[in-house]
Amino acid sequence: MFRVSLQATRRVAFRSARQIRFYSAHPPSGGVSHMNKPALLLAGFSTLGAIYVADGCPTLIERKPAPAEKPAEETPAAGQSQSISEPTKDADESPVSAQEEGAEPVTTPENEITYSEETHQALAATLSGDEPAAIEPVAESVNEQATEPAASGEATNEPVTGISEDTKAPSLSFDDSKTAKGVVLEDEADKKEIQQTSPDAVKTASKDGSEGESDVVLHEKSPAEAETITEAEEQAEIRSISGGTAEQSATAAAAAAGVQGEKKNEQQTAYNPETGEINWDCPCLGGMAYGPCGEEFKSAFSCFVYSEADPKGINCVEKFSTMQNCFRKYPDYYAEQIKDEEEASAEASKIEDKSTTPVSTATSTVEVQTENAVFEPVLEKYVEENPQLKDTPEAAAVTNTDDEKK
């Protein structure tokens, strides 16, 4: 700064000297004295001003003072709230804290409640359940000396925070909680466990633990006596019954009725001879009672079941033919039944060509052969599983046929 001022002073002095010399050598048209006075005054003031600045004197234009550094904020001691003046609080845009509104100070590492060894031992004894003891916390701060617990019963003015005197030990220990959880798990396992009942009825346990009779009664047949009928065999049996005529259907039903007489060999059927009712929801029917031809199927099946004619079901031929005609109207739905009927008819036709019966009885022969081809597997199954039926007239035909084949 001093060097710049010195250079400016020299320039002004040289310029003033030039002007004085110029005006002295070339005076204007007026008087010389009149023109030299302003030049001399200008040169003189310029020189004085340069010298004034060069000497480090204060300038006429004052500079703005540099901003002073803010003093570091003092952190209040533990247990003391920071006092904020009203102007500073108004100027501060930050929200007012809860402590400024009068709330109790939050426990921090600097302002936390500590306990003496005696108090700690009393607390441990209380939690273990040996003896109840009142806990008197002692607050220790930076600026205040630690006070001893009032053993003599003296009251203190400072508010006591932390654990109250009503603190109690937990009701269950770690081992007790494990035991309680084990009891709950065992109870749930007992509820979900499937209970076994007598062979008269099969009962299952629901998720709620309540027992109820199942809709479908399971087979109660021991594996040593006979094999259980699978669902596929039952479906094939019903399709065979629906595709055949009344005579062989009566034979199959009679064999089934004989099997039902034995409790140990009891099979799953839609008809219950004890109650005389037909369970149309039985899985053995394959849902045919609710198809497009459900009414025709119910009519033919119930007629066969309740038939008292000899042979059984001979009076239901028309209803079975009506059911078969209905099947042909819905080939997509009853494709398997129609296929079984056609195969049975084809086999019966081959047998008829080889036979020597008169032409007058050809029609009846074809019907009988068709029925035999459809219901023969069903009757064989019942006869094999129930040897006591071999002496019945309905099963005699099947036995003779097997002997002839052998």
UniProtKB/Swiss-Prot annotation:
Region (Disordered): 67-110, 142-276, 341-365, 384-406
BP GO terms, sorted: protein import into mitochondrial intermembrane space
Extent of the transit peptide: 1-23
InterPro entries associated with the record: CHCHD4, GCK_dom
Positions of short motif Cx9C motif 1: 293-303
Entry's Gene Ontology molecular function annotations: protein-disulfide reductase activity
Residues on Mitochondrial intermembrane side: 55-406
Cysteines engaged in disulfide bonds, as pairs: C282-C284, C293-C326, C303-C316
Mitochondrial matrix side: 24-37
Localization annotation: Mitochondrion inner membrane
Position of sequence motif Cx9C motif 2: 316-326
Sequence intervals crossing the membrane: 38-54
Cofactor info, note text: Cu(2+) or Zn(2+).
Membrane topology: Single-pass type II membrane protein
Record bears the keyword Flavoprotein: no
Keywords: Disulfide bond, Membrane, Mitochondrion, Mitochondrion inner membrane, Oxidoreductase, Protein transport, Redox-active center, Signal-anchor, Transit peptide, Translocation, Transmembrane, Transmembrane helix, Transport
Keyword Nucleus: no
GO cellular component: mitochondrial inner membrane; mitochondrial intermembrane space
Subunit description: Monomer.
Description of its domains: The CHCH domain contains a conserved twin Cys-X(9)-Cys motif which is required for import and stability of MIA40 in mitochondria.
Function: Required for the import and folding of small cysteine-containing proteins (small Tim) in the mitochondrial intermembrane space (IMS). Forms a redox cycle with ERV1 that involves a disulfide relay system. Precursor proteins to be imported into the IMS are translocated in their reduced form into the mitochondria. The oxidized form of MIA40 forms a transient intermolecular disulfide bridge with the reduced precursor protein, resulting in oxidation of the precursor protein that now contains an intramolecular disulfide bond and is able to undergo folding in the IMS.
Protein name, UniProt field: Mitochondrial intermembrane space import and assembly protein 40
Organism: Kluyveromyces lactis (strain ATCC 8585 / CBS 2359 / DSM 70799 / NBRC 1267 / NRRL Y-1140 / WM37)
